[in-house]
Amino acid sequence: MRKHPFHLVDPSPWPLLASFAAFLSTTGGVMYMHAYSGGGLLLAIGQLSLFYVMYVWWRDVIREGTYQGHHTNPVQVGLRYGMLLFILSEIMFFFAFFWAFFHSSLAPTIEIGAVWPPKGIQVLNPWEIPFLNTIILLTSGASVTWAHHAILAGNRKQGIISLAITVLLAVIFTGFQALEYLEAPFTISDGIYGSTFYLATGFHGFHVIIGTIFIAVCLFRLVLHHFSKSHHLGFEAAAWYWHMVDVVWLFLFVCIYYWGGA
């Protein structure tokens, strides 16, 4: 059993229940946007159900890998490929947003004054909060790498400290991003600039929140002795995801904040 290449799992109700929760969320979202009665309630029920199913599903995955020994070396290879493909799919999302941004900025139409940024848009100074957030996020990338080296060296204390620093920096980044949104002189409704800016940076912020939860769970698991030198796939996946968030932010800073606001 130790070397078999098959990802054997117990029968689980969570995939079916997740699809039902996603259906409720989608239906409720459409009803809410069209002001139908009960749309908001249905959306809330669907979202809460989806979050609960995600929690219990990942709980079962942790049990299978940590306590039941289902995650053999060949299975871990498959899980790594799956995580890499997932990260690639996320990068394709951002590729679409950058495409929309450059399509609009490299050849601005007459409707926005044939200039970029569009006339009437007061852009953000890239050397204030955006640059500070860049430093914070790059520092968090360094601290998560520190945690990886600590786990590989068997230094659990350093791993816990470095992961706690990563979570703290991620929360600070999110707080500054929220402050930037509150003080921004334009909204998502302000034409193509506002829509592309908030879509790209907001989607990245959503990924930061997901990554923060991911790393916080890894911190909790490290405290519970779930990770060892040779078996810490959950942490590796979180670290890869966080580095993807770092790299995407660098492109956002250079392309949208610096070049796009010049």
Swiss-Prot record:
Matches recorded under InterPro entries: Cyt_c/ubiquinol_Oxase_su3, Cyt_c_oxase_su3_dom, Cyt_c_oxidase-like_su3, Cyt_c_oxidase_su3-like_sf, Cyt_c_oxidase_su3_a-hlx
GO biological process: mitochondrial electron transport, cytochrome c to oxygen
Domain of life: Eukaryota
GO cellular component, one term: mitochondrial inner membrane
The UniProt record lists the keyword Mitochondrion: yes
Membrane topology recorded in Swiss-Prot or TrEMBL: Multi-pass membrane protein
Keywords from the UniProt entry: Membrane, Mitochondrion, Mitochondrion inner membrane, Translocase, Transmembrane, Transmembrane helix
First-level EC class: translocase
EC number: 7.1.1.9
Molecular function per GO: cytochrome-c oxidase activity
Substrates-to-products reaction catalysed: 4 Fe(II)-[cytochrome c] + O2 + 8 H(+)(in) = 4 Fe(III)-[cytochrome c] + 2 H2O + 4 H(+)(out)
Predominant cellular place of this UniProt entry's protein: mitochondrion
UniProt subcellular location: Mitochondrion inner membrane
Transmembrane segments: 13-33, 38-58, 82-102, 134-154, 159-179, 200-220, 237-257
Family according to the record: Belongs to the cytochrome c oxidase subunit 3 family.
Biological function: Component of the cytochrome c oxidase, the last enzyme in the mitochondrial electron transport chain which drives oxidative phosphorylation. The respiratory chain contains 3 multisubunit complexes succinate dehydrogenase (complex II, CII), ubiquinol-cytochrome c oxidoreductase (cytochrome b-c1 complex, complex III, CIII) and cytochrome c oxidase (complex IV, CIV), that cooperate to transfer electrons derived from NADH and succinate to molecular oxygen, creating an electrochemical gradient over the inner membrane that drives transmembrane transport and the ATP synthase.
Subunit structure: Component of the cytochrome c oxidase (complex IV, CIV), a multisubunit enzyme composed of a catalytic core of 3 subunits and several supernumerary subunits. The complex exists as a monomer or a dimer and forms supercomplexes (SCs) in the inner mitochondrial membrane with ubiquinol-cytochrome c oxidoreductase (cytochrome b-c1 complex, complex III, CIII).
Protein name as annotated: Cytochrome c oxidase subunit 3
Organism: Prototheca wickerhamii
